[in-house]
């Protein structure tokens, strides 16, 4: 039977999403969703949304939402592009900055969508193994540059470990690589604020850094599919003007995104509760003999004791 697929599409395996239990009894943890509901401001904005607005196309570049996000991060609107969740942000970065036949580098293990996006682009995924303690190897940038990576991705905090790479190391990587560094901060809202981590200076000081954020985890809006990229205007403008889909963010998502950002008190209270429960769970697992990686996310990577039967 003949196929009309491009050869690289025919060869590749697609992305496998997490299992979606339907019995209504399973406690769903496999996609790291926020256990708390969205802000009441989001519910109110949805209730007040006039369906007559759906007759016309939404504001093409979601400027009001871009302004809110820029203010939140201490940046300008020209340094922000809104995307259809973090996954579209990744796709746009690959489409814009990785040539067919080029290389997309990341750490291993990492988000399983990365190699899929590379293969769709007919590019080569290139993996650099993390150290045994989940840290990024000192020669990571050297290896990525030797592979001629046009786009290099670091998940921070990392999934599946929860380990946080300090901004100082990310500055060094940005300086040493030859292409674009994309920092995937899908879980950054759960970082302990006392650590003082921020990627704003990375965006301000390097013209080759993109930072990915999403509303899915921290703002409990995984079902809405809303995210964004931060970066130097020279990186953001081609995405907005050339590779982004037309009207990629619908009117409802723009309105609800603004509502979520307006209620920082609620958002930060849920993040604090997640951190409290994370610490409590790690302590309880430790008392049972489990080993947990220090996490700055909303999940824990835990290893059972050798005698797991006894621990149970």
Predicted regions: what is each one?
Residues 102, 123, 177-180, 184-185, ...:
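A short helix->loop->beta-strand "cap" motif at the edges of active sites that frequently abuts
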Residues 132-191:
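Active-site phosphate-binding strand-loop segment of PLP-dependent enzymes
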Residues 63-103, 121:
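Phosphate-binding glycine-rich loop
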Residues 279, 286-291, 299-312:
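Conserved C-terminal alpha-helix-loop-beta "cap" of PLP-dependent enzymes
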Residues 96-154:
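PLP-dependent aminotransferase-like
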Residues 208-286, 290-293:
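PLP-dependent aminotransferase class I/II
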Residues 1-56, 148:
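N-terminal "arm"/small-domain region of PLP-dependent enzymes with the aminotransferase-like
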């Amino acid at each position: 039977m003949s196929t009309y697929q491009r050869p690289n599409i025919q060869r590749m395996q697609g992305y496998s999403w997490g299992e979606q239990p339907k019995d209504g009894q399973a406690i769903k943890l496999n996609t790291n969703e926020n256990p708390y509901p969205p802000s009441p401001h989001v519910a109110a904005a949805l209730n007040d949304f006039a369906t007559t607005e759906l007759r016309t196309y939404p504001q093409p570049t979601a400027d009001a939402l871009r302004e809110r996000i820029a203010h939140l991060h201490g940046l300008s609107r020209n340094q922000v592009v809104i995307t259809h969740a973090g996954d579209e942000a990744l796709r746009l970065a690959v489409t814009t900055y990785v040539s067919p036949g080029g290389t997309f580098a990341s750490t291993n293990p990492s988000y399983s969508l990365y190699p899929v996006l590379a293969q769709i682009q007919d590019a080569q995924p290139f993996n650099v193994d993390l150290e045994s303690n989940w840290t990024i190897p000192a020669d990571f940038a050297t290896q990525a540059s030797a592979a001629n990576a046009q786009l290099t991705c670091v998940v921070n905090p990392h999934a599946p470990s929860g380990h946080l790479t300090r901004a100082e190391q990310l500055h060094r990587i940005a300086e040493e690589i030859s292409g674009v560094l994309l920092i995937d901060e899908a879980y950054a809202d759960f970082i302990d604020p006392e650590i003082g981590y921020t990627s704003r200076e990375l965006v301000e000081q390097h013209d080759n850094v993109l930072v990915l954020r999403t509303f899915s985890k921290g703002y409990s809006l995984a079902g809405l599919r809303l995210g964004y990229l931060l970066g130097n205007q020279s990186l953001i403008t081609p995405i907005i003007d050339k590779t982004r889909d037309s009207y990629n963010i619908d009117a409802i998502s723009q309105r609800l995104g603004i509502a979520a950002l307006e209620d920082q008190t609620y958002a930060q209270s849920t993040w604090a509760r997640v951190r409290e429960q994370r610490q409590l769970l790690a302590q309880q697992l430790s008392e049972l003999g489990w080993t947990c990686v220090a996490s700055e996310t909303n999940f824990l990577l835990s290893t059972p004791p050798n005698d797991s039967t006894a621990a149970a």
